[in-house]
Amino acid sequence: MASSSFSFLLVAALLGLASWKAIASDPSPLQDFCVADLNSPVRVNGFVCKNPMNASADDFFKAAMLDKPRDTNNKVGSNVTLVNVLQLPGLNTLGISIARLDFAPLGLNPPHTHPRATEIFTVLEGTLYVGFVTSNPDNRLLSKVLNKGDVFVFPEGLIHFQFNPNPHKPAVAIAALSSQNPGVITIANAVFGSNPPISDDILMKAFQVDKKIIDLLQAQF
């Protein structure tokens, strides 16, 4: 009887683990492919499939020109070119997307998170200082200087950043993300540029600064 109970608990635990794993990332495909029907009025977790008989090679192709430099003339000096399911419908249900990241000298991809994806990141040109911060209560910063050909991984959901420390040369990187639609939350934009704005009282208490500083920060976004 004890042995049977243990076996039942073991099976239940394994099933629970398998179920957790199944919902921890994009759902696994149940067919060869599921090209997203971006025009369908049906709303599901992801996108409904177009008729597979109407699929063509173009559904799995995007002339994204990821070999071409992007404009980094902005406040932070960086540009992210993402190819996800919205640009490439064939990615639907496949659990992956790709991005090119361009950095001006001293350019920054500000602290942000991807709520639905782990990111693996490799430098193609230049040098980048990258890092992520662990969750509460430790909030440890794990960081590294990457050179051409180096690879770094950012765990799903954790705040991370990339910065070009070179004042004279640009940098380029490619990232792959473990979701067809990884999402991005840029921390400063979300906190100080939300719509409608977060109450000054909340931000003043959270950051332990006065209203003048909060107003200054909100004005940037």
UniProtKB/Swiss-Prot annotation:
SMART domains: Cupin_1 (SM00835). This is Germin-like protein 8-2. Pfam families: Cupin_1. Glycans are attached at residues 54, 79. PROSITE patterns: GERMIN. Keywords: Apoplast, Disulfide bond, Glycoprotein, Manganese, Metal-binding, Secreted, Signal. GO terms for molecular function: manganese ion binding. The gene is GER3. Coiled coil: none annotated. Belongs to the germin family. InterPro entries: Cupin_1, Germin, Germin_Mn-BS, RmlC-like_jellyroll, RmlC_Cupin_sf. Mn(2+) binds at residues 112, 114, 119, 160.
